[in-house]
């Protein structure tokens, strides 16, 4: 499904740097994997902790309208699964530190774009940055595919080895990878480029609005890298990953 994207202009401020957030400057070698020339991908999907830091900065700068656009919708958990299963998640997934390293979900494409703009401004204003000018952004579908090109490990959901006998018997379901919902980032083995969760965990938003990689709720066949997922945002099965493009070294 191709989503129509709307952009909001944000006033973004420089604060310290961390994870891909505030306590340290980004370590490109540690945090990113080179995809092509001056293009790098984050090793993991954006987490609750990272996204919450972005939201906090909007509040600190009194960017009320932008915060309203970018805030997550926790009630989407209740719409996807039964109340008994999801009420704890709806109440705590985005705020409890237990889930800090879980992927952010239940946001819109505007929220993903806003986060990228914020991260770009922080980096480019940090005097300790490695590169003179970069842009953090969502990947195009083609760039996302480059992230998994020649990936021999990419046939497993969440890069987790699902027993083939279960698949051949036709009884594979979305809990066979070891997770009933989302799982913490980097929980499973990375692909052969060192990128985590390219298949499964959460489907990832691309620049064109297509969703790639499948989610915790998809069967293995639905997570094929060639396929697109068809969800309306916000959704508890959808998050995003940032790419970094070096504009000036």
Cite the ranges covered by each PLM segment.
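Bacterial Sec-dependent N-terminal signal peptides
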Residues: 1-30, 147
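Intrinsically disordered, low-complexity segments enriched in glycine/proline and serine/threonine
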Residues: 5-7, 207, 248
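Functional-site microenvironments in short loops/helix caps that host divalent-cation chemistry
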Residues: 24-28, 92-236, 246
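A short glycine-rich, aromatic-capped structural motif
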Residues: 25-91, 103-111, 200
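Flexible, glycine-rich phosphate/dinucleotide-binding loops
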Residues: 61, 122, 249
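Short beta-strand-to-coil "C-cap" segments at the C-terminal boundary of structured domains/repeats
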Residues: 242-249
């Amino acid at each position: 499904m191709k989503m129509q994207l709307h952009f909001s202009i944000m006033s973004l401020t420089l604060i310290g740097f961390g994870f891909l957030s505030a306590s340290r400057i980004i370590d490109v070698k540690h945090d990113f994997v080179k995809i092509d020339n001056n293009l790098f991908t984050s090793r993991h999907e954006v987490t609750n902790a990272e996204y919450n830091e972005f939201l906090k900065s909007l509040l600190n700068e009194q960017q009320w309208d932008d915060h309203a656009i970018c805030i997550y919708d926790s009630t989407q958990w209740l719409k996807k699964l039964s109340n008994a299963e999801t009420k704890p998640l709806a109440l705590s997934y985005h705020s409890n530190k237990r889930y800090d390293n879980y992927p952010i979900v239940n946001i819109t494409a505007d929220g993903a774009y806003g986060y990228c703009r914020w991260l770009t401004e922080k980096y480019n204003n940090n005097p300790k940055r490695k590169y003179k000018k970069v842009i953090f952004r969502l990947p195009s579908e083609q760039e996302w595919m480059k992230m998994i090109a020649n990936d021999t490990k990419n046939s497993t959901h969440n890069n987790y080895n699902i027993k083939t006998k279960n698949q051949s018997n036709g009884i594979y379901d979305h809990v066979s990878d070891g997770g009933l919902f989302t799982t913490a980032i980097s929980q499973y083995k990375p692909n052969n480029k060192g990128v985590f969760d390219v298949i499964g965990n959460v489907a990832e938003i691309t620049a064109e609005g297509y969703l790639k990689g499948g989610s915790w709720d998809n069967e293995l066949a639905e997570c094929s890298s060639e396929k697109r997922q068809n969800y309306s945002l916000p959704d508890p099965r959808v998050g995003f990953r940032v790419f970094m493009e070096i504009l000036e070294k």
